[in-house]
């Protein structure tokens, strides 16, 4: 099995965010000191990085499933969870990342291009990690001072991507099968490709580094092309993409072929036609030179054969009339290789400068609008408002006549994932958020009634429930209610002196009530004094008669009250 793999499908998943904590602070003499649950850690992301030491995508064929680290849950004492570790995956320079499209269980095909990792260090985040859930200390506010719940961490992004390697070489050797391309790259570099005397010996591209004095450049040996390669015939369509990144195209022509209806000029025009058809389908990167405009050279091979030598001298003027540089070589005797080597080196140096100038000019001409920088992947505020444009509500009807309402939107779907439906307070908090966003108003506008089925999200993350409209976003809006707002612990309210602060009117009313009580006591004492209770020594102080402050008359021995 070849160790060269230039296309693979990889399943990537970002790490899940950690759950928030719903801890309650406990101290000596303060059994209920308020919330102190920390936030969950964010999940790690899956990142592809262009690495010059990577040469193939073979590792991803045997290990196609890659998952980043998940964040840990928050803890009490306001301790946040740790962030999941990012998964850094090296790929060869020249790798293009595509979105994979296709039905589940079937072969995927490339969709939209996500990134073009052409240079060393280029990065692409293909699966974002999930955000950690907020702890109850982050959910607290002036009306919800002791939340008994926390938010769950979000799931990491999960998707299939296709990695496609397009070799980055300075020179591409193109030609018919058995034209001597592999022999040429073996003679000019240290690469040892498979060489045999039958067509299509080369099944994968070979890259070799060639040294010419103080400079060096790379050559790509592309498998043999035949007429119809741009439409998928032979092996050409699989490897024509390796020509996209080369700046110079070298036609290797076999002057010793014995096949009928073939000659150097017809071979050249046939291959040029295939390259032109393939170039029409390409979307070139920034600063790239279109394939038809790239410089060409013609290499007439196998001149060690006398008949081939004569044919090369005969067709050379025809190629020169087309403005092409022609080199006569023999890979067997190494004749003409030195001249070819230094000529290619000079041409490569010239093209590198031209490409650099093109990229700089294109970059300066672009208008870049930078978005506002925000810390984190989303606002850390719990009660996020919004407008109706951030979600959609559609009325759906099933085949059996049942009707349901489908809610789609980034915020509603994320809030559903963050909610622990085993906690009634968390469910009520979700209802408040949806009402504040305007979901309930939109449901009413679409004709929804209490008890109708509502679905939020899609796929495995979808949540179904019977709609029960809230009352002005919760109990905290009900004046005079003893229920308290969601997240309000009445035990804490009793311990907080701020909740018992009296108004001036209440202070005046309490003062007048106290003064009236004192006046009543003074009047009772004056009545006892006038009755002589305090001046008569024969009166028992413990006796309670009708003149006493607490007396109601004294009973006689026969049970009758004395007058």
UniProtKB/Swiss-Prot annotation:
Subcellular location per the Swiss-Prot or TrEMBL entry: Cytoplasm
Domain OBG-type G: 169-349
Binding site for GTP: 175-182, 200-204, 221-224, 301-304, 330-332
Pfam families found in the cross-reference section: DUF1967, GTP1_OBG, MMR_HSR1
Hydrolase among keywords: yes
Domain of life: Bacteria
InterPro entries: G_OBG, GTP-bd, GTP-bd_Obg/CgtA, GTP-bd_prot_GTP1/OBG_C_sf, GTP1-OBG_CS, GTP1_OBG_dom, GTP1_OBG_dom_sf, OBG_GTPase
MF annotations from Gene Ontology: GTP binding; GTPase activity; magnesium ion binding
Sequence segments annotated as region (Disordered): 529-563
Record-annotated Obg domain positions: 2-168
Domain OCT stretches: 383-469
BP term (GO), one: ribosome biogenesis
Keyword Magnesium belongs to the record: yes
CDD domains hit by this protein: Obg
Cofactor(s) required, per the database record: Mg(2+)
UniProtKB keywords: Cytoplasm, GTP-binding, Hydrolase, Magnesium, Metal-binding, Nucleotide-binding
GO cellular component entries: cytoplasm
Binding site for Mg(2+): 182, 202
Disulfide-bond pairs as recorded: none
PANTHER family the UniProt entry points to: DEVELOPMENTALLY REGULATED GTP-BINDING PROTEIN-RELATED, MITOCHONDRIAL RIBOSOME-ASSOCIATED GTPASE 2
Family: Belongs to the TRAFAC class OBG-HflX-like GTPase superfamily. OBG GTPase family.
Alphabetical list of HAMAP family matching this protein: GTPase_Obg
Task of the protein: An essential GTPase which binds GTP, GDP and possibly (p)ppGpp with moderate affinity, with high nucleotide exchange rates and a fairly low GTP hydrolysis rate. Plays a role in control of the cell cycle, stress response, ribosome biogenesis and in those bacteria that undergo differentiation, in morphogenesis control.
Protein name per its UniProtKB record: GTPase Obg
Organism: Bifidobacterium longum (strain DJO10A)
Designated gene of the protein: obg
């Amino acid at each position: 099995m070849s160790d060269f793999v230039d296309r693979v499908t990889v399943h990537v998943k970002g790490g899940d965010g950690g759950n928030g904590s719903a801890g309650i602070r406990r101290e000596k003499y303060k059994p209920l000191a308020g919330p102190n649950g920390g936030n969950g850690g964010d999940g790690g992301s899956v990142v592809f990085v262009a690495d010059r030491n990577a040469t193939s995508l073979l590792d991803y064929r045997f290990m196609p499933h890659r998952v980043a680290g998940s964040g840990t849950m928050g803890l009490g004492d306001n301790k946040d969870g740790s962030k999941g570790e990012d998964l850094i995956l090296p790929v060869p320079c020249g790798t293009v990342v595509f979105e994979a499209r296709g039905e589940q269980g079937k072969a995927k095909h490339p969709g939209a291009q996500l990134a073009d990792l052409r240079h060393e260090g280029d990065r692409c985040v293909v699966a974002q990690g999930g955000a950690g859930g907020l702890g109850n200390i982050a959910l607290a506010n002036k009306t919800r001072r002791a939340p008994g719940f926390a938010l769950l961490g979000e799931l990491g992004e999960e998707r299939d991507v296709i990695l496609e390697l397009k070799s980055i070489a300075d020179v591409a050797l193109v030609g018919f099968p058995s034209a001597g391309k592999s022999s040429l790259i073996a003679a000019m570099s240290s690469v040892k490709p498979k060489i045999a005397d039958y067509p299509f010996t080369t099944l994968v591209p070979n890259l070799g580094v060639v040294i010419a004095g103080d400079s060096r450049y790379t050559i790509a040996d592309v498998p043999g092309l035949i007429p119809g390669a741009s439409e998928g015939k032979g092996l050409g369509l699989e490897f024509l993409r390796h020509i996209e990144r080369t700046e110079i195209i070298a036609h290797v022509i076999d002057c010793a072929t014995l096949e009928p209806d073939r000659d150097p000029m017809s071979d050249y025009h046939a291959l040029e036609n295939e390259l032109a058809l393939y170039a029409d389908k390409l979307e070139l990167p920034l600063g790239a030179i279109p394939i038809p405009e790239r410089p060409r050279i013609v290499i007439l091979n196998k001149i060690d054969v006398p008949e081939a030598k004569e044919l090369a001298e005969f067709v050379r003027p025809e190629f020169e009339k087309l403005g092409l540089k022609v080199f006569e070589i023999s890979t067997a005797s190494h004749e003409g290789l030195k001249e070819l080597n230094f000529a290619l080196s000079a041409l490569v140096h010239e093209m590198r400068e031209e490409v650099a100038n093109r990229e700089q000019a294109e970059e300066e001409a672009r208008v870049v609008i930078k978005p506002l920088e925000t810390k984190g992947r989303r606002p850390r505020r719990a009660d996020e408002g919004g407008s109706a444009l951030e979600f959609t509500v559609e009325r759906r009807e099933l085949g059996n006549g049942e009707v349901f309402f489908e809610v789609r939107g980034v915020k509603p779907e994320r809030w559903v994932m963050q909610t622990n439906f085993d906690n009634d307070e968390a469910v009520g908090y979700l209802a408040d958020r949806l009402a504040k966003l305007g979901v309930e108003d939109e449901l009413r506008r679409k004709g929804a009634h209490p008890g109708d089925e509502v679905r939020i999200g899609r796929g495995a993350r979808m949540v179904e429930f019977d709609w029960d409209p809230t009352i002005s976003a919760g109990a905290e809006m009900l004046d005079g209610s003893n229920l308290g707002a969601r997240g309000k612990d009445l035990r804490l309210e009793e311990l907080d002196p701020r909740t018992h602060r009296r108004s001036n009117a209440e202070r005046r009313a309490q003062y007048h009530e106290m003064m009236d009580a004192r006046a009543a006591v003074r009047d009772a004492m004056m009545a006892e004094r006038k009755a002589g209770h305090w001046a008569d020594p024969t009166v028992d102080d413990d006796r309670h008669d009708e003149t006493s402050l607490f007396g109601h008359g004294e009973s006689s021995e026969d049970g009758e009250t004395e007058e």
